[in-house]
Amino acid sequence: MKFRNLAVVIAALFLVAACESTSTESGKGSGDGKQMAKKGKKKGPPKGFSITPGSSQDLVVNVGDRVFFALDKSNLSSDARSTLEKQAAWLKKYGSVKITIEGHCDERGTREYNLALGERRANSAKDFLVALGISPNRVNTISYGKERPVALGHEESSWSQNRRGVTTV
């Protein structure tokens, strides 16, 4: 069942990515992932797909599963807080759902440093959700440090995509 859910999420992400137009952004800017966060805010499932309410696909497509961080920081930006507020509302709607928040970093820094930073990032997101009324028993955290990048480049535009927190169901 989990494999099927994962396959549906991956298929949906490919469809969404295939529909996106090419960007002319230079990759320069604040470097906190705000541009990437805005790109991921598409509403509703792709045509021909139905989303099970309360599922991981529902979270990804209708709420957003990622928040982004500035270099060497674990504090939440206003965009990150906005996404987490939506996640909290979604979690209140689906009271039996448990989540894991993954903390990720870019490739710079040692493995140990990035694991600790990823943990701080995941805990920052968890603490915010708990402050909004979500039971801490429903929220697990894990740090992957720099071990699971989503962008493989060696420049700021890639690094800003990798400095993230990802909420999984």
Model regions and ranges:
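Solvent-exposed coil/turn segments that connect beta secondary-structure elements
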Residues: 72-74, 89, 104-106, 144-147
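Bacterial N-terminal signal peptides that target proteins for export
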Residues: 1-7
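A non-catalytic structural micro-motif
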Residues: 95-104, 119-150, 163-169
